[in-house]
Amino acid sequence: VKTHADPGEAAPRRGSRWVVDVAILTGALLVLVAATLAARWAWTPAPGPEEQVSCAPYGLEDVSTTPRGGARPLSTGPVLSGGLRWAEGTSDRLDVTFEHEGTTSSYHVFADGIDWSEPVGVVFRLHGDGAYEYEHPGHKVSCLAEVARSHNAVLVAPRTPDRQGEPTWWEDLDGNAEWFLALAEQRIFAEYDLDRSRTWLHGYSGGAEFISYELLADRADFLQGGGAVLSGGGGAPSTGTSEPTQEQLEQLVLHWDVGLEDDGTDPYAPFDALSAAAAGHAWYEDAGWARTSVRYREGVDHFELPEARVLDAAMTAGESPGERSAELSGEPSTEPPKRGRD
């Protein structure tokens, strides 16, 4: 019986068993990780096509578009300096802050897909009371931006600077107008190479009231071409200080669009947009605006207006002055509402 190792026999290495155990454990762990990843890859579907939003609720039955804003990070975009203007390569910019004389709010610019080698127009979209569409641009606003893009125009959607209760455009007409016009002049027209003869105002509900009571009535010189679309509102101002040129009176397109069911009897829409639109259209027509039109839509309430289709028709009319648009004044729903209607 050996009591010690032979001189020529290697002594056993201490810790060799531990090394073997660690190697076995590591191998098992690697196998487990590989199996887990393989299972995950096997059960994770490949990325599908980019989500699309249907524009059918806004009047464009066969049009779908990529949601703007809702499925992408917000960004203020590159910083401009030295008088540089946006040109090729510009894209959507969301929640950009703008301050004017102590009043601050924000705006979106939708510029994806614009051909900057051609003249570029602009649509200013003014939201209704509550600013819901500003906070959720992935639906209606995305479809309006697609309409604007189809006419090679950017869409600018500002949020009212109003912070008193429910955000509105019409409760502080002068203050909101000063901020809005400063935004247009100091940011939008200063930073983007735009054709001002293709400038459009597009307002819904309270945004339409802001256009008719203030922007057209007192600040019409802002519109050097294009026109205004007033959806679900746009009443008659008590007075008007604007002195439009003969060219403006003859060429600017002013269109009101309202549902015959939009008379304020719906508890969810207590504003009588029907009467407001009728009065606003009559006021501007009497004031000498030659290209006014109004469409009263049968069976339509405050929430069912085909706004994207109407914007497209109005912009097309602006590009083709000699053509009459059936969409803007087509039968059978062109008659004004009867007074005293229940």
Where are these regions (language model features)?
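Alpha/beta-hydrolase-fold serine-hydrolase catalytic core, especially in secreted/extracellular enzymes
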Residues: 54-55, 287-291, 298-299, 306-309, ...
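A domain-start/cap signature at the N-terminus of enzymes
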Residues: 21-24, 35-121, 176, 280-282, ...
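The feature captures the conserved acid-bearing segment of alpha/beta-hydrolase catalytic domains
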Residues: 226-315
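Terminal targeting segments of Actinobacterial cell-envelope proteins
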Residues: 1-17
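N-terminal Sec-pathway targeting helices
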Residues: 12-28
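Alpha/beta-hydrolase active-site loop
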Residues: 169-193
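Short substrate-entry loop that stabilizes the transition state in hydrolases
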Residues: 114-167
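Primarily recognizes the serine-hydrolase "nucleophile elbow" in alpha/beta-hydrolase
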Residues: 191, 197-249
